[in-house]
């Protein structure tokens, strides 16, 4: 599996790659149906925001709805990323139809993303422990629903694997499997959840990532969990998804 909160993790993963350890992508196919360059998402101007679809939330609203720096969720602690957003435009997929499984950054997709807030959730002091990248994104023109459609297509088209391309390395995804999604309840329009099996850079070890994305109106909440090791840890901790969802709903739909 897309990295749990990691420019922390992804940053750690990159450091391990460059140090010759194992990560090629414990974090996170092509071309559209109309052909073209399979290695990059099709460019072109983004569609203008239309009146269709729910109103996009502002960055201030997303910030209020997200975990705060230092907030605790059971044994986990939330923090802000210090090296920029995780799963940024440095991450692309080959073939390109798999891009939503790697990164939904504005510069590598054609969706009208208006605002984004990113948090890292992990166990304080555990460098090699489980880490979750929590990303809240708001879209205009009904594009949040199109993000979920693209994610669903990627999950089907890329089931047998694809390549994640980064500036310092390539990661081989061996398998993309749908898994049981959490029950978010009222306000959740649709949910997708996946398990990724990833080959380490040396081509010897199998790593695991899990991705859960839920849409509520114009907003998507993405949870990507990873572990720097070969253990299949079973999925994104529901204590994290539940706590973030509850906080999000308390802000966007109080009462």
What are these regions (language model features)?
Residues 226-255:
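Surface-exposed amphipathic alpha-helical segments
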Residues 13-17, 23-65, 92-96, 102-103, ...:
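N-terminal low-complexity, Pro/Thr-rich disordered segments
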Residues 132-135, 218-227:
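Short, well-ordered beta-strand elements
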């Amino acid at each position: 599996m897309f990295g749990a909160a990691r420019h922390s993790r992804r940053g750690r993963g990159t450091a391990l790659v460059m140090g010759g350890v194992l990560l090629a992508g414990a974090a996170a196919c092509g071309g559209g149906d109309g052909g073209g360059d399979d290695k990059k998402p099709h460019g072109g101007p983004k569609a203008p925001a239309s009146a269709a679809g729910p109103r996009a939330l502002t960055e201030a609203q997303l910030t209020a709805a997200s975990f705060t720096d230092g907030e605790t969720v059971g044994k986990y602690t939330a923090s802000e990323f210090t090296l920029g957003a995780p799963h940024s435009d440095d991450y692309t997929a080959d073939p390109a139809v798999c891009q939503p499984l790697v990164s939904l950054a504005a510069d590598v997709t054609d969706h009208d993303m208006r605002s984004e807030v990113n948090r890292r959730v992990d166990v304080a002091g555990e460098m090699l422990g489980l880490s979750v990248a929590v990303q809240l994104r708001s879209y205009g023109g009904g594009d949040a629903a199109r993000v979920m459609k693209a994610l669903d297509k990627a999950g089907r088209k890329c089931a047998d694997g694809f390549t994640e391309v980064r500036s310092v390395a390539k990661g081989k995804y061996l398998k993309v499997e749908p898994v049981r999604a959490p029950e978010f309840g009222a306000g959740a329009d649709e949910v997708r959840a996946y398990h990724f099996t990833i080959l380490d850079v040396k081509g010897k070890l199998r790593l695991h990532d899990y991705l859960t994305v839920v849409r509520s109106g114009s907003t998507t909440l993405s949870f990507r969990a990873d572990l720097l090791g070969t253990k299949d840890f079973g999925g994104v901790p529901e204590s994290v998804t539940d706590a973030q969802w509850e906080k999000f709903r308390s802000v966007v739909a109080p009462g």
